């Protein structure tokens, strides 16, 4: 009797991942798409802010785009480690004026922090895939930093937006992002990354073009 033995590498690993970690795979695919959208959104917002002569707002958008890019990279790695081939298609985004863009960004960050990320973590924790839990937890904490950075500008996105924005634009600004977790800060932390506890050396200064 002839028995054909196929090497394990020929079997679709994604089937194994889906059977062992179905919720983790599902959530990681969703959040990866979300990060690709967020990065595209902030890149577009930065271009619009420059067009409207708000270089500091553009700088913030560039820093946030860099952070979202790191989140996406981490989610992509989790999926690949599980044997999946995630789609990296960049979505198109709607862009308004800078005031509207700040409003939309603040709303999106708030929804992620208060609703989506807690729900996603609750879904994947029972499967206990530690890399996915760590990546999602770090992204959640970094998104809270995004909200805080945006809130300074969003508070003035009503009738006083123009006056407040012009005042803010006169203040020099730098942004630093942790290349491990996407933590985004206006200055380097003193000891370690407040999100992933990595060394300060993991932070890079974002080239905002200002």
Regions found by a protein language model. Name each.
Residues 16-210:
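Non-heme di-metal
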Residues 1-9:
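Bacterial N-terminal signal peptides
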């Amino acid at each position: 009797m002839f028995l054909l033995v196929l090497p394990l590498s020929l079997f679709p690993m994604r089937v194994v991942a889906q059977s062992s970690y179905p919720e983790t795979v599902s959530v990681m695919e969703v959040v990866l798409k979300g990060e690709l959208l967020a990065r595209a959104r902030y890149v577009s917002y930065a271009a619009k802010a420059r067009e409207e002569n708000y270089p500091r707002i553009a700088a913030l958008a560039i820093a946030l785009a860099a952070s979202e890019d790191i989140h996406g990279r981490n989610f992509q790695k989790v999926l690949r480690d599980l044997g999946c081939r995630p789609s990296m298609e960049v979505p198109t985004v709607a862009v308004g004026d800078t005031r509207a863009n700040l409003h939309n960004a603040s709303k999106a960050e708030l929804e992620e922090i208060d609703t989506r990320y807690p729900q996603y973590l609750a879904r994947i924790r029972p499967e206990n895939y530690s890399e996915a839990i760590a990546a999602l937890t770090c992204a959640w904490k970094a998104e809270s930093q995004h909200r805080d950075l945006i809130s300074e500008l969003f508070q003035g996105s009503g009738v006083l937006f123009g006056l407040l924005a012009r005042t803010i634009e006169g203040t020099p600004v730098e942004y630093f992002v942790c290349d491990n977790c996407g933590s985004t800060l206006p200055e380097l932390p003193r000891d370690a990354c407040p999100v992933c506890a990595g060394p300060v050396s993991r932070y890079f200064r974002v080239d905002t073009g200002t």
